[in-house]
Every structure is written in structure tokens, then in C-alpha cells.
Swiss-Prot record:
Its main location: cytoplasm. InterPro entries: ProQ, ProQ/FinO, ProQ/FinO_sf, ProQ_C. Residues 117-131 have a biased composition (Basic residues). GO terms for cellular component: cytosol. Belongs to the ProQ family. This is RNA chaperone ProQ. GO terms for biological process: post-transcriptional regulation of gene expression. One of its GO terms (molecular function) is RNA strand annealing activity. Keywords: Chaperone, Cytoplasm, RNA-binding. Pfam families: ProQ, ProQ_C. Residues 115-138 are annotated as: Disordered.
């Protein structure tokens, strides 16, 4: 009885598989280490009996891994290349460091262009409305405090709510507050310091 092996189809799944199989060489999080020159051949030999990955898929996954920003960040002066087992396999030369820096700069520029285009498209979809300059400037509220001892049921007062004052009618006078009914029908308890004439 033979079990069917599930083939890995996308590059991301293949990279995850490589990171599981060769954890000292491939990393999924953090800074990636520069890979040994000719690592593809080593990988092809190590995985030749593995039915999950074809050479073409392996090449595509390796291309994606080495063009990732994390990998390009790791390719800096003095960085040491690693083989499949994580052993040192030579230091990056200046030419490769410069190439990685150029690739990273180009990738960032493409990303910035794409982001700017998406932002522009979003703005076209939902343009910002200009401020209405015809709105009246509201003057500061000039409210005079009401003598709480003079308030009785039926008195018309103003209730301060934030920066606004609403007209209200006193429904009940309590010890240090009053129950009022706003013009919209809402009944609420209001502290004496929030009532004005």
C-alpha cells in the first residue's frame, strides 16, 4: 500500500518546507543569511528523491527567497554565506553587497510607486470634500449662571452640553440638580452648575 505524496505547488509553501528541512540555512522570520553560491545544485541533490518539489519549483522558490527584502537586508558587507547545514561558505564580496543594495532600493521604489498609485486611486474613488467656508463662525457661548434657589417646575433654562447650550424646561427640582426636558423630548438629570439662564 503506497501513500500518495502531496506536491507543494506555490513558492511560499516550498520556502516553508525548506526552512523546516534546513533550519540553519533558510529562515522564515528575522534576518535571512546570505546563501552559498551554487546552493541550488546542493538543494537539487539533497531533494532529488523528494517527490514534493520539482527543480523548476525549487528554482522559483529560491529566486523568491533571495529577492525578499529580509534576504537583501542580510546581504551587507562582512556577511558570511551559509550552506544547507548552516556552515560558513565564504564572505560576501563587495560586488554582491552592492547588487543586493541596488535590488533592495529598486524593490522599495517599486513598492513606493505602487503605494502612491493605490493612494491616488483611493483619492479618486473618495475625493476629500473641501471645507465649507460659508459656515457661520459660532460665537463663544455667553451664558449667565442661574440662581438655583430661584428654579421651579416649568422654568425655562439652558443646559450646557459640551460647547453647546440646549433649551430645556425644568420638570423636577432635586437637592443639587434638576430633572429637565430638552426640546427633543429627552428627560435628564442635570447638575446645578450645568444650568444657565
Amino acid at each position: 500500500m503506497q501513500t500518495e505524496v502531496q506536491k507543494l505547488t506555490n513558492a511560499k509553501a516550498i520556502i516553508t518546507y525548506l526552512a523546516e528541512k534546513f533550519p540553519l540555512c533558510f529562515v522564515l522570520e528575522g534576518e535571512a543569511k546570505p546563501l552559498k553560491i551554487g546552493l541550488f545544485q546542493d538543494l537539487a541533490e539533497a531533494l532529488q528523491d523528494d517527490e514534493r518539489v520539482s527543480k523548476t519549483q525549487l528554482r522559483q522558490a529560491l529566486r523568491q527567497y533571495t529577492s525578499n527584502w529580509r534576504y537583501l537586508y542580510g546581504c551587507r558587507e562582512g556577511a558570511v554565506r551559509v550552506d544547507l547545514q548552516g556552515n560558513p561558505a565564504g564572505v560576501l564580496d563587495a560586488e554582491h553587497v552592492a547588487h543586493a543594495a541596488q535590488q533592495l532600493a529598486e524593490a522599495k521604489a517599486r513598492f513606493a510607486e505602487k503605494r502612491a498609485a493605490a493612494k491616488k486611486a483611493q483619492q479618486k474613488k473618495h475625493p476629500r470634500k473641501p471645507a465649507n467656508k460659508n459656515l457661520k463662525k459660532e460665537s463663544k457661548l455667553s451664558l449667565s449662571a442661574v440662581d438655583f434657589s430661584q428654579i421651579s417646575v416649568g422654568s425655562v433654562v439652558k443646559v450646557k452640553a459640551g460647547d453647546n447650550a440646549k433649551k430645556a424646561t425644568v420638570v423636577e427640582v432635586l437637592k443639587d440638580s434638576a430633572r429637565v426636558e430638552l426640546e427633543n423630548g429627552l428627560i435628564m438629570n442635570v447638575a446645578a452648575d450645568r444650568l444657565f439662564a
